[in-house]
Every structure is written in C-alpha cells, then in structure tokens.
C-alpha cells in the first residue's frame, strides 16, 4: 500500500462493511470478541480498508478505522470512471471492473460498492467472480485499483507522448 498519503490532510468518510462476532472456546465456555471491517475514503481518489478486533463493537470499529487510515491508496479517475478495464485478484476472490458511461452509476455489490463510492468513482460496472467473502472482495478490488494506469503513465512507460499513444 502507498504510505506517503497523509490521512490528516484528507476529509475522510468511513463505512463499516461487516461486524462479525468471533468466539474463542476456553475451558469455562466461550469468549466473544468482535471483528470489524471498515473502508475509508475521501471520494476524491483516495481509499483504504482496515480491520480491528476488540471486546466491544465501537472499539473494534475505531481500531479498524485507524488501520484503514494507515493503508490508503491513490486511485486514478478519468471523469467519473476508471481509465480502463481491470481484473483484481486476491486469494480466490476475483473482481472484474469495467469503465462505464456517465450516468450509469456504481453497478456493484456489497463491499466492492463501498470501496468504489468512497474512492470517488461515480460510473462503473463490476462483477464478482469466485469467493464472495468480504475481506477477499475488498482486497481483490484494491489490488485492481492499484494496478490501474492513466494514459500518461502508459505513455511514459513506452517512451511516447499521449498524442502518439491515443491517435
């Protein structure tokens, strides 16, 4: 993840994706804790996710938000969509993301929608392939978003100008 993004300079919004009650079985019975999965973003090209565990739900969410702020990435956005089609993968979670025409909206489910909306993507088509576990879907989506390249990046890699590349 990109570490040079300062979360204090961004106006971050947070969204809780899941809160899960987990149990540790001990001799005297079960010990319950809560695991939270949170996505944060500024709706302007910066997004991150984090996890937190604690005895109480609010404390787990707070830990997850702090973790998410440490894992911010920058997402290239062209207009209201992404620059090109991309396939993100993590474990058995696969997410296919395609740019969409303006006015389409975010066509996506669950955790992927939370990431894309908080990243500031307004029009996109997505399809979840494989595992639908929230953590795997989030990591697969972030993997895809980190691999996005703008036309300027591709032109620089090829040693050409953007005009030569596009036309």
Curated annotation (Swiss-Prot):
GO cellular component: small ribosomal subunit
MF GO annotations: rRNA binding; structural constituent of ribosome
Record keywords, A-Z: Ribonucleoprotein, Ribosomal protein, RNA-binding, rRNA-binding
One BP term from GO: translation
S5 DRBM domain boundaries: 12-75
Function recorded in the entry: With S4 and S12 plays an important role in translational accuracy. Located at the back of the 30S subunit body where it stabilizes the conformation of the head with respect to the body.
Domain remark from Swiss-Prot or TrEMBL: The N-terminal domain interacts with the head of the 30S subunit; the C-terminal domain interacts with the body and contacts protein S4. The interaction surface between S4 and S5 is involved in control of translational fidelity.
Name of the protein in question: Small ribosomal subunit protein uS5
Taxonomy of the source species: Bacteria, Bacillati, Bacillota, Bacilli, Bacillales
């Amino acid at each position: 993840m990109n570490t040079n993004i300062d979360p204090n300079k961004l106006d971050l919004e947070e969204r809780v994706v899941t809160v899960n009650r987990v149990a540790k079985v001990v001799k005297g019975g079960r010990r319950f804790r809560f695991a939270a999965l949170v996505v944060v973003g500024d709706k302007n090209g910066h997004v991150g996710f984090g996890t937190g565990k604690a005895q109480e739900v609010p404390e787990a969410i707070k830990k997850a938000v702090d973790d998410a702020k440490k894992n911010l990435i920058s997402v290239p956005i062209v207009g209201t969509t992404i620059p090109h089609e991309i396939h993100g993968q993590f474990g058995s979670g696969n997410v296919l993301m395609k740019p969409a025409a303006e006015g389409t909206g975010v066509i996506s489910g669950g955790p992927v929608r939370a990431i894309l909306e908080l990243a500031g993507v307004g029009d996109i088509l997505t399809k979840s392939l494989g595992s639908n576990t929230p953590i795997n879907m989030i990591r697969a989506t972030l993997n895809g978003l980190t691999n996005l390249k703008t036309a300027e990046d591709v032109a620089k890699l090829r040693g050409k100008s953007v005009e030569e590349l596009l036309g």
